Design a protein with these regions (language model features):
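Active-site-adjacent structural elements that line small-molecule/cofactor binding pockets in enzymes
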Residues: 1-167
Length: 167
């Protein structure tokens, strides 16, 4: 990633996705549970950021990763490293994202909920002397008329319900 960052001229960011539904993860060969995956992500980001910053060789001995004299010959072009984006609002996700990410990605939920999340995330980031940026993602449903848009919305909701129900 640091090499790509140098090649494309400081336009790279990395969005960290820890995973989704356990069944989907197992399909990809990842049999860790939800909270374990976030502990692994925390370790991975700790190691990756230290390699990118490249202050010299370091050792790391964690639950999931162990490195000795880790170092890269290539540092990130961006300082201190490639910007990290992160998403996830579970109890396991919030501390990891607040500790490591530069921009926290949230969905455009009711504004009160977004405000509560941002307050909590800011408090968590402050524990690490960090300030977060935010990306708020909205998914507009557009149609020729308001009634047609609501019809599309109901169809999307029914599709989600059908996909998420046990078969």
């Amino acid at each position: 990633i640091a090499t790509l960052d140098n090649l494309i001229g400081d336009r790279l960011l990395v969005h960290i996705i820890t995973g989704g539904v356990d069944a989907d993860q197992r399909r990809d060969g990842d049999f860790l549970g939800h909270d374990e995956r976030y502990r692994r992500t925390d370790e991975y980001l700790e190691v990756m950021r230290r390699v990118w910053i490249n202050d010299g060789p370091f050792d790391f001995d964690g639950e999931f990763y162990r490195v000795q004299k880790a170092q890269s010959e290539v540092s990130s072009a961006q300082s201190p490293h490639v910007p990290l984006w992160f998403g996830g609002i579970s109890e396991a996700a919030i501390p990891v994202g607040a500790k490591h990410c530069d921009t926290y990605a949230l969905f455009g939920e009711p504004l009160g909920h977004v405000r509560e999340l941002m307050t909590r995330l800011n408090a968590e980031a402050a524990k690490y002397q960090r300030e977060l940026k935010y990306n708020l993602s909205f998914r507009p449903i557009i149609a020729d008329t308001e009634d047609a848009a609501w019809e599309k919305a109901r169809a999307i909701l029914e599709g989600v319900k059908a996909e998420s129900s046990p078969h």
